[in-house]
Amino acid sequence: MEKPIKPGRVAALACLLALLVIVFVVALYKLQIVDGKAYYEENRNSVASSQTVEAARGSILDRYGRVLVSNTSCNNLIFNPDDLFEQDDPNGILLQMARTVASCGDTYVDDLPVTSAPPFAYTDMNDTQRTQIRGFLKYAGLDEEATAVELMSYCREKFEINNNYSAADMRIIAGLRYSIKTRYIDKLYLPDYVFVKDASMELITSLKENNVPGFEVTVSYTRQYHTNLAAHLLGYTGLMTAEEYTTYKTQGYPMSATVGKDGAELAFEKYLHGTNGTAIVTKNASGTVTGTTYTTEPEPGDQVSLTIDLDLQSAAEQSLTKGIENMKSKSTKNSDAVGGGALVAVAVATGQPLAIANYPTFDLQTLFQSEENYKAVSEADNQPLFNRALLGQYSPGSTFKPCTAIAGLTEGVITTGTRIQCTGTFRKYEDTGYAPKCWIASSGVTHGNDNVTEAIRDSCNIFFYTVGDSLPIDTLARYAAAFGLGEHTGIELPESTGQMATEAVKKKLENTNWYVGDSLQAAIGQSYSLFTPLQLAEYCATIANGGTRHSASILKTVRSYDGSELIYENEAEVLSTVETSDYNWAAVQKGMYLVANDRAGSAYETFGDYGVKVAAKTGTAQLGDNQVNNAIFICYAPYDNPKVAVAVVVEHGSAGASIASIARDFLDAYFTVKTVNTAPESELSLLQ
């Protein structure tokens, strides 16, 4: 039997239902009737736009994970043209903003290449500015040869700049209007105009507190350099030029993208550059962001580790600077002539560059802080921007003699037991008027009866003239190429290939015949041979390891942005080999050992009492025209278990023996650092 429903319960449920209906109706009334107008106005005045979200660029690290270059975020001010030019007096607003920027100690970007006050004249222009001004003159219907005064007159009229403004204020307004306008001229391919880069909070606050319209704050990344070392290797970034855009646009780059311009930043652009994202940004009537919804998340660039050891790079730069400046400070007739130089150190087993130093160098952190800074560095007489280690080309002098020795031994021209009498003069062609001398002849003595090992120790010209006379020059050139001399090294940065002296090279350079004297001079590292310090270091490493020449790539690994995923690991690549017997290698290596460890050796004074046994070769490259000789020095250590090969070049350094101390200072640091960095590299990378 069913229980009867009590009337009280029915009444209670009915009351509860009625109460809920009343609450819903009241809420609906408030939403649509009371607050409806406000919501309508807010929605009507809200603006949603799709914006690009810049991706962070990848970091650059040394071989042990120490950060060399990373990013720092900054606030930029950009103009909102739709808002700015809806105002009654946009020119007045621009002038107000420019004055506010100056009062806050910030600087703004003015692309107009015209002086700041009359009489107006064009200023010096870079390539981008020239393209920009040509495009604007064409747009304006002005002649390409229009004067700055004619251009300013056009700007005053075109941009409706009131005559009440002073000439200086008119120039400020014209510069900003020009900078904005050129972004909308077809086919100029200019990056987005950023009014103030890395704006201070004082500036942003001042503009907002004064309700200055027409601008927006965006966030971007700038490169932060954690070291003042390796400036020539790291390189720098910048906005694309119109020419660069034609290449990068096929890869999906926007015109406003920042790209690598030089060094590792350029070489490894494909890894370092991230992929921008997009977001829907909603702003209310006052311009305040009320919502951000990512439609595509930005993907940051990858983390690139170089083969360079930061500690060794520091040691290389310090040793080179100290050595050259000491040479300059000496009161000798040649001290004023001492110029720039380079030191390169590579791993014998892999060919990986561990340090690449140049003198003079520069500081990437300050180079682009102002036009004055850049001009001072770029126009300096001693060329600090020139990468001597990779682009400098120098005659190797006697450092080439081990190559001649290997060629002679391998081709059977000599054996390890062959002895050649040094008489001070090579007389074979004396009847033709050509009788080159050994360097020691000026002292009134000779080297005696040398074998190949002793000839390397003594650097006897007569011995190597004899070998060179018996070797076809193209055969000697083939061995030089196998050692990497006059060949690409495999480094990812711009480099000179140099040249080995041959009949074809002389014909190309001078359109004259090849003579026997050319072969003799080529055999001792003179003639037309020119090599880079990096090539000399890799050549020395090839001697040290018994004939295997590796690529000089500076890329070690590529990891994901946070370092959690290994994307690419560079393995040692063999570029060529020098095939000869172990006996031949031992004879040449022993000769280099004696250079540093026998009292008759030219580097004995520097390395005779050194704690690690070193093998070395000094070189003096004659320049002619009464110029002071270049000094060349190569070495590897330890002699019995080679780990590192070093090449040092000092322009007008007089003689190779005089710069051996630079290499010694570097090796002091190398063997100190080596005891510190003994943990496996995989473990060290986890400690970063």
Locate each region found by the language model.
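Beta-lactam-recognizing serine transpeptidase/beta-lactamase-like catalytic domain environment
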Residues: 69, 75, 283-295, 308, ...
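Conserved, well-ordered alpha-helix/loop/beta-strand core segments that scaffold catalytic motifs
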Residues: 289-341
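Solvent-exposed, polar/charged alpha-helical surfaces in well-ordered, non-transmembrane soluble domains
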Residues: 91-99, 201, 205, 209, ...
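Amphipathic, well-packed alpha-helical segments that form the structural scaffold of globular domains
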Residues: 245, 273-276, 284-287, 317-325, ...
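Short alpha-helix boundary/capping segments
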Residues: 89, 308, 580, 651-659
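Solvent-exposed coil/turn segments that connect beta secondary-structure elements
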Residues: 36, 58, 66, 73, ...
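Membrane-proximal periplasmic segments of bacterial cell-envelope enzymes
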Residues: 1-272, 276-297, 333-334, 339-342
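Flexible helix-coil linker/hinge segments at domain or subdomain boundaries
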Residues: 672-681
